[in-house]
Amino acid sequence: MKIRNYNGEDLQCKVYIHENRKEETILVSVPEIFFSIQIDYDIYGEALVEHIYLHLFNLLDEKEANHLALSIAQWTAET
């Protein structure tokens, strides 16, 4: 499991990322905003950012949701 610190304009939190290689999924959790999402390996790049953004948009303002989505996409791409 990876733990990353997110420091946005209005939100500072920890992001927990767990990779399940057997099921080819990634679980992302942000407890501070009661958010979690399971992502399949076949979603990546701009599609991944958009997918995460659409879920975060319900919880955060547009700018913060986009910035956090970009950060999560970058962190999940790390090997």
Predicted regions mapped to residue ranges:
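Mixed-charge, Lys/Arg-enriched low-complexity segments
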Residues: D42-T79
